[in-house]
UniProtKB/Swiss-Prot annotation:
Catalytic reactions of this protein: Endohydrolysis of (1->4)-beta-D-glucosidic linkages in cellulose, lichenin and cereal beta-D-glucans
EC number: 3.2.1.4
Described purpose of this protein according to its UniProt entry: Has carboxymethylcellulase activity.
The protein's name in its UniProt record: Endoglucanase Cel12A
A GO-annotated cellular component: extracellular region
UniProt source species: Gloeophyllum trabeum (Brown rot fungus)
Family recorded in the similarity comment: Belongs to the glycosyl hydrolase 12 (cellulase H) family.
Keyword Hydrolase applies: yes
Top-tier EC class: hydrolase
Cellular localization per UniProt: Secreted, Extracellular space
Length: 36
């Protein structure tokens, strides 16, 4: 599926990296979060 890489900065100054895997035409999204 389509993989989207997104990096977000929260007020807690934590950087969270998300890999979104769209698995089907229904738009199923599986977010995998990694704290660094």
């Amino acid at each position: 599926g389509v993989q989207i890489s997104q990096i977000s900065s929260f007020p807690t100054t934590a950087d969270v990296s998300y890999d979104f895997n769209i698995t089907n035409a229904l738009g199923g999204i599986q977010p995998v979060g990694s704290l660094k």
